[in-house]
């Protein structure tokens, strides 16, 4: 998407890019020009791709913790999708992976480990931006509980979650509450839905897992106020 601003009417909004590849190449060429690197008249074009002719020019590797931290702290959808496809590659290592492989991996874990019927839920991407994802608070809570009881999962997950009033997508929330510096949770929002899920320590020192999903939300700000109040109560 590209942000659009109209000075005359003081309007700011977002529009979808019709062809993202054209936008990418146009922006890429513009950045090259800014660095003094110019190209000819015919700057770029599409060409047919033969599968056997695909070659890897370079590989960039990053520790999974770095990708996880950016996916959670900054709510980076690209990092979330990358982890989704990485999971898919582990689940189906012998062919070119697709989103269905990632969905199958999640469904298998959901059924064999958590004991939930995958037919009752629907997951179509790794970032959660699709309106065709359907899960329940109870299912998400079971994932959080499973992570807590497996320290090799919990420790990097806990460190990567935004901290209320401190950083990430929760940097400006719950600042004047008991939840500040205590709640570690992931935010989520699509049209009409706002969510918050993670961990909070109660006054007795016990670690609590919680999931809040508000549906049919007209104003996301109101849902966030509600979520923040719940977190404040859980912290007391």
Where do the protein language model's features map onto the residues?
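Small-residue-rich helix-loop
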Residues: 84-236
């Amino acid at each position: 998407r590209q942000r659009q601003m109209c000075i005359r009417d003081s309007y700011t909004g977002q529009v979808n890019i019709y062809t993202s590849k054209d936008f990418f190449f146009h922006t890429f060429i513009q950045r090259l020009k800014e660095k003094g690197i110019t190209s000819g008249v015919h700057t770029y074009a599409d060409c047919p791709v033969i599968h056997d002719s695909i070659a890897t020019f370079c590989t960039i590797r990053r520790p999974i913790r770095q990708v996880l931290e950016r996916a959670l702290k900054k709510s980076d959808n690209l990092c979330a999708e990358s982890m989704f496809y990485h999971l898919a590659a582990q689940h189906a290592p012998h062919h070119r992976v697709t989103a269905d492989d990632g969905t199958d991996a999640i469904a298998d874990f959901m059924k064999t480990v958590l004991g939930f019927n995958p037919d009752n839920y629907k997951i179509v991407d790794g970032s959660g931006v699709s309106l065709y994802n359907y899960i329940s608070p109870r299912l998400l809570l079971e994932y959080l509980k499973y992570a807590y009881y497996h320290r090799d999962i919990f420790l990097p997950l806990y460190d990567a979650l935004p901290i209320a009033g401190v950083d990430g997508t929760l940097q400006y929330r719950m600042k004047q509450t008991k939840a500040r510096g205590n709640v570690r949770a992931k935010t989520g929002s699509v049209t009409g839905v706002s969510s918050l899920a993670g961990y909070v320590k109660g006054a007795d020192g016990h670690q609590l897992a919680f999931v809040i999903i508000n549906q049919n939300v007209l104003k996301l700000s109101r849902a966030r106020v509600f979520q923040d109040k719940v977190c404040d109560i859980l912290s007391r």
